[in-house]
A protein has these predicted regions:
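C-terminal hydrophobic helical "lid"/dimerization subdomain
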Residues: 2-15, 19-31, 280-284, 325-384
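Glycine-rich cofactor phosphate-binding loops and adjacent beta1-alpha1 units
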Residues: 4, 193-195, 235, 240-316, ...
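Residues located in well-ordered beta-strands
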Residues: 32, 43-48, 60, 90-92, ...
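Glycine-rich beta-strand-centered segment in the early N-terminal region that forms part
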Residues: 50-64, 77-124, 160, 167-169
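NAD(P)H dinucleotide-binding glycine-rich loop of Rossmann-like/cofactor-binding domains
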Residues: 119-204
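Mid-domain Rossmann-like dinucleotide-binding core that forms the NAD(H)/NADP(H) cofactor-binding site
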Residues: 170-250, 255
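Residues in the short beta-alpha loop(s) of Rossmann-like NAD(P)-binding domains
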Residues: 230, 298, 323
Length: 384
């Protein structure tokens, strides 16, 4: 009866208010969450449902994608415990704080967890991820704010409600919508390369992020070469129209790309795989004067590469991290208009009760695993 209409506007508003109050009263006092307790230690626990204040909303989580940055934090112990991670979050508004007019109980939304101030030195220079406000996480399921998507409910703070919460149109699934933030990061990274139509771009790694990057790069009018160690991922890339693939378990990707470019190498290389040992092969695959984008090197450390490749060969080494408000609308339109069927990238869906298992699989990818999501909004044993 979602499309039913009452006879007068005043009655409709009254009924809507009553339904809103009834749904808000159903919110429990406790919830389940996958809680990070230390290096490689995540437990399913019962925790309080977060309280919200004025200008905030409480989100009932349906789907949260597992991001590689969360996995690195869990594995490295770089962040203090306890925390509840998960930031690729879509769900339904369960409660609204005083003063919230943009959203109502029952609205389907997806949330960003970082939004910059727009006024500081870094914002004025378009390096939003370095803004101190941006570095504050505006979504939490309790403990130190860390996203909170691996829980049943998430508190979305005021500045995220105002600028980082996006309504999901009818006909778009929670699964499709949860890709808004990762797509944003990909669009931002690609813009860093200043690609020109006709250039040859090699994308190293065809996990979900690498495949999105490759799809977007091809959309920009370039010739795309994809590489991966797992042939099923290359098959998936092929199904998205990415037909130039290199099985890196069998061939030297840099050699292949040079053979395809009259010995030069790629105009640009995107490294979409973590691991500093791959930085040098990425640089080697780029032509003299080419560009190399590090997209997955989010853990601080040291790497070995030939400095003459930058100085003498005039190759440019670039980095891109997190999302950009400048491409927020572009990323939303890309996802919500289904310019790419992102749901196809999801290989495994886990209930929250199996969240620890989901994180383990994501941290140890298999040939047949791609995007892995945790779905607090789907009970154990149920179907979508």
């Amino acid at each position: 009866m979602a499309n039913a209409r009452t006879s007068t506007l005043s009655i409709e508003r009254s009924d809507s208010t009553e339904r809103s109050e009834e749904r808000q009263s159903r919110i429990p006092s406790t919830m389940k969450a996958a809680v990070y307790r230390g290096v490689n230690e995540v437990r399913l626990e019962t925790v309080p449902v977060p309280e919200i204040g004025a200008g905030e909303i409480l989100l009932r989580v349906h789907t949260c994608g597992i991001c590689g940055t969360d996995l690195k934090k869990i594995a490295s112990g770089s962040h203090s415990a306890p925390r509840i991670f998960g930031h690729e979050t879509s769900g339904t508004v369960a409660k609204v704080g005083d003063g919230v007019e943009k959203f109502a109980v029952g609205d389907r939304v997806v949330v960003f967890h970082h939004i910059p101030c727009g006024k500081c030195y870094y914002c004025l220079h378009k390096t939003f991820a370095q803004c101190e406000t941006y570095k504050k996480v505006g979504c939490t399921a309790g403990f130190e704010p860390s996203g909170g998507g691996f829980a049943e409910y998430v508190r979305v703070m005021g500045w995220i409600v105002a600028q980082g919460t996006v309504g999901i149109p009818d006909g778009i699934s929670f699964e499709q919508a949860c890709f808004v933030e990762p797509v944003n990061t990909c669009i931002k990274g690609i813009k860093t390369l200043n690609l020109e139509a006709g250039e040859t771009v090699m994308v190293m790694g065809q996990g979900p992020i690498g495949l999105i990057l490759a799809f977007l790069v091809k959309r920009a009018g370039t010739r795309v070469i994809t590489t991966d160690l797992y042939s099923p991922r290359l098959t998936m890339a092929n199904s998205f129209g990415l037909n130039l693939t290199v099985d890196a378990s069998k061939e030297d990707a840099a050699k292949v790309v040079r053979e395809m470019t009259e010995g030069r190498g790629a105009d640009a290389v995107i490294l979409a795989v973590g691991g500093n040992s791959l930085i040098r092969p990425a640089i080697d695959a780029a032509r003299p004067g080419g560009r190399v984008l590090l997209f997955a090197q989010t853990v601080r450390g040291e790497a070995t590469f030939d400095p003459a490749s930058v100085c003498v060969d005039e190759k440019t080494l670039l980095g891109s991290y997190s999302a950009s408000v400048d491409v927020q609308e572009e990323s939303v339109q890309f996802v919500m208009n289904r310019e790419m069927d992102l749901e196809r990238l999801i290989s495994h869906r886990f209930s929250l009760e199996s969240g620890v298992e989901a994180l383990h699989l994501a941290a140890h990818p298999q040939p047949d695993s791609m995007k892995i999501v945790i779905q607090p909004g789907v009970r154990e044993g149920s179907t979508l």
